[in-house]
Regions:
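Functionally engaged cysteine thiol sites
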Residues: 6, 105, 183
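Active-site/substrate-binding loop(s) of hydrolase catalytic cores
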Residues: 20-166, 170-171, 175
Length: 201
């Protein structure tokens, strides 16, 4: 993770939890590129963008690097990791884990290649590390998590349509359809919102 600022309010901006989304091969790379654009803007203009001492911004440019770089499909390894953990905690290569279906919020085991998520939550090292990270950086002020995906023109948020996160996104993406995170089964952002108390999308 890359940190900008040292405020008590925390923003976690996460990208490419699916190395392959649904538009074209390795389209998660566009999300990684967007993360790098954000990092460049923060490096060059942090003082103009954010009041000193107000926010700590963490950018995680690629949550699923093995899926992005070693995967080959949006319906298995690529969208998912290229491995999973067995009962002994060892890597088993083959059907990987859909990291965005593997968090302990409304978790339901999925066996299809596209959304395979193991027999229990957090059966991938990336998901375990991500959960620990989000818990460890939580601030004493506002906590916001943005899990960036692509292509569906929807803004999936906690806090409803009147909440601050949806209102901020709707100002810039008014064409996007509103969806609630509350129904997300194993979603990273749903877990952050309803278990860890982040405002999330």
């Amino acid at each position: 993770a890359y940190r900008y600022g040292d405020g008590s309010n925390v923003l976690v901006a996460a990208f490419a939890i699916h190395g392959w989304e649904d538009n074209f091969n390795r389209d998660g790379q566009l999300l990684v590129d967007t993360a790098h654009d954000l990092m460049e803007a923060l490096e060059q203009n942090y003082d103009a963008l954010i009041k000193e001492g107000d926010w700590s911004v963490y950018v995680l440019p690629c949550l699923n690097p093995d899926g992005l770089y070693d995967g080959w499909t949006c319906n298995g390894p690529g969208r998912c990791t290229t491995y999973r953990l067995n009962a002994n905690g060892n890597n088993v290569y083959g059907p990987g884990i859909d990291l965005n279906r593997s968090f302990p919020y409304r978790y339901q085991s999925r066996s299809d290649d596209r959304n395979y998520n193991g027999s229990a939550p957090l059966q991938a090292r990336e998901a375990q590390a991500l959960a620990k990270f989000v818990q460890s950086v939580k601030g004493s002020g506002s906590n916001v998590l943005i899990d960036t995906h692509g292509w569906y023109r929807q803004t999936i948020v906690s806090g409803g349509e009147s909440g601050p996160v949806y209102r901020a996104f709707n100002r810039y993406f008014p064409q996007n359809r509103y969806t609630s995170l509350a129904g997300g089964s194993g979603y990273f952002a749903s877990w952050a919102a309803y278990v860890e108390d982040y405002d999330a999308c």
